[in-house]
C-alpha cells in the first residue's frame, strides 16, 4: 500500500490554551503548516478537562487566562497527563512563579 494514501498516518496533536485569539490563531496556523493537528481552548476554566480528556501530544499553555490561571491548570493536569506542557507569558515577572 502506498503510504502517501494512508489516512491513518499519525499527526502530532497540540492543544493550545490561550485567551489571546490572535496569538492562538497565528500559533495554530504555524503548527498546522508544519504538520501538526491543533485544537484551541480560550478559557482556562476548561483547560484541565481538555488536557485530561484529549491527551494531546503537547500542550501550549498561557500563564494568564480567564477562569483559571496556567499554573493552576498545570498543577491539576500533571497527575493525569505525562506529555510536555509549554508555558507562555508576555510578562517577565511571571517567570519566578514557573
Where is each model-derived feature located?
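N-terminal/domain-start alpha-helical segments
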Residues: 1-98
Amino acid at each position: 500500500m502506498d503510504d502517501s494514501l494512508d489516512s491513518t498516518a499519525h499527526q502530532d496533536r497540540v492543544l493550545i490554551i490561550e485567551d489571546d485569539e490572535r496569538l492562538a490563531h497565528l500559533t495554530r496556523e504555524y503548527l498546522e503548516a508544519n504538520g501538526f493537528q491543533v485544537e484551541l481552548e480560550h478559557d482556562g476554566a476548561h483547560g484541565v478537562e481538555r488536557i485530561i480528556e484529549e491527551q494531546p501530544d503537547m500542550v501550549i499553555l498561557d500563564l494568564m487566562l480567564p477562569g483559571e490561571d496556567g499554573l493552576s491548570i498545570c498543577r491539576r493536569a500533571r497527575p493525569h497527563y505525562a506529555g510536555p506542557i509549554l508555558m507562555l507569558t508576555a510578562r517577565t515577572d511571571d517567570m519566578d512563579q514557573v
